[in-house]
Amino acid sequence: MTDRADADRPATSPTGLRLYDTMTGAVRDFVPLRDGHVSIYLCGATVQGLPHIGHVRSGVAFDVLRRWLTAKGLDVAFIRNVTDIDDKILNKAADAGRPWWEWAATYERAFSAAYDALGVLPPSAEPRATGHITQMVELIERLIDRGHAYTGDGDVYFNVATLPDYGKLSGHRIDDVHQGEGVATGKRDQRDFTLWKGAKPGEPSWPTPWGRGRPGWHTECVAMCEAYLGAEFDIHAGGMDLVFPHHENEIAQAEAAGDGFARFWLHNGWVTMGGEKMSKSLGNVLSIPAVLQRVRAAELRYYLGSAHYRSMLEFSETALQDAVKAYAGVEDFLHRVRTRVGTVVPGDWTPKFAAALDDDLSVPIALAEVHAARAVGNRALDSGDHETAMTQARSIRAMMGILGCDPLDERWESRDETSAALAAIDVLVRWALDSRAEARNRKDWATADQIRDRLKEAGIEVTDTADGPQWSLLDGDSKDV
């Protein structure tokens, strides 16, 4: 998916890969910092609730990038963080009457289950924000020492005016910056952003030279990038909603601290419904367990990965079912070849498939190659040309493997992936219902109703029976607790 005429020329990078860099606004040759090695940092989840399909799109999109780089023989270090301390986590845990750390750990497991259900490879490391407080404090101290940060009323702020080129990633003019943090009495300038929040009653806090408190959102990723990938690395990735303020503020801190930081910035588009970003606040989310009641995990993965990663993916039931049919066509062909010809081992992808992925991960074009091979293979199989059919089947396995949804891969064939995902969700629902039962026992009806309503938003219906609560996915299977 090229954006400029010169992007159509053959790749000249040693990897053969060209990627769209948000910083430059162009498709550029990807040349790793270290020959044969690629370092990637993906902004992961803020673990405040059950994951919906909008949350996991970045995981699927950049899993394809990782698989393609690995297939090219590169050693990939892939880091995906977990934000386990945040205002929303603290507020939701308090509303439910649960410890904040337990709340975060529970939904971290929910995200892990969702990624696993969709065949996303586990990261090389998955650091939690709370495990890197020391590194954050050290980073903030460096920023204060260099004159880029200051303390105020127990908080610590980054002084945006000290960086003349602030806003270069997002295109924001420094005079027009609005951080969306609200009014803070300790700020010298409302354009500044928070690095550290002073301690508040009832909230977790850690000791620092400027008093107890907890980290701001933008600091954790810079500290963890440094800890796992060094002062300079190849690719920083995330959803396009993170360009500003999160990634802009990461760049500000890293450069102010003297780091080279990321050499490429990659951002995936949203999953939308009715033209709006999928968001709990808008009430237009589709939880992973709810969708997996209607389609298999491999089919959902195919659907989420079928659009170009930078494009918006407008969800519709028709589009989802079209993806199911397309995936079934590939699956049926491979099964036919295996039944009539023999074992199908992955072969070689086609040159057009490779060219598509080398052109900024143009998955729609790559999938067109898959279906072209399927059409050739089906005709060959029907005419008795088993050799051609097998060649096409082996090529399809190679291509679908890069896309993470090879129908003959053992992860899809050796288990009922939907049942596995539902089993993971069952653990989480039981935890929520235990919290609801505790609230009911202390006659806290508002909290009990809130937990039930949140489950319903995630596509989970709770029914109170004489034998205890029973939960079910809306229009799906039910389970006793």
Swiss-Prot record:
Cofactor: Zn(2+)
EC number in record: 6.1.1.16
Entry superkingdom: Bacteria
Segments carrying motif 'HIGH' region: 45-55
A molecular function (GO) term: ATP binding
Organism: Mycobacterium sp. (strain JLS)
Gene Ontology terms: biological process: cysteinyl-tRNA aminoacylation
A Pfam family that the UniProt record links to this protein: tRNA-synt_1e
Family annotation (InterPro entries): Cys-tRNA-ligase (IPR015803), Cys-tRNA-synt_Ia_DALR (IPR015273), Cys-tRNA/MSH_ligase (IPR024909), CysS_C (IPR056411), Rossmann-like_a/b/a_fold (IPR014729), tRNA-synt_1_cat_dom (IPR032678), tRNAsynth_Ia_anticodon-bd (IPR009080)
NCBIfam families given in the database record: cysS
Main location: cytoplasm
Family indicated by similarity: Belongs to the class-I aminoacyl-tRNA synthetase family.
Quaternary structure annotation from Swiss-Prot or TrEMBL: Monomer.
This protein's name: Cysteine--tRNA ligase
Metal-binding listed as a keyword: yes
GO cellular component term of the entry, any: cytosol
Textual note on the cofactor: Binds 1 zinc ion per subunit.
Class of this enzyme: ligase
Residues at which Zn(2+) binds: 43, 221, 246, 250
Transmembrane segments: none
Residues bound to ATP: 280
Ranges spanned by the short sequence motif 'KMSKS' region, renumbered to the chain: 277-281
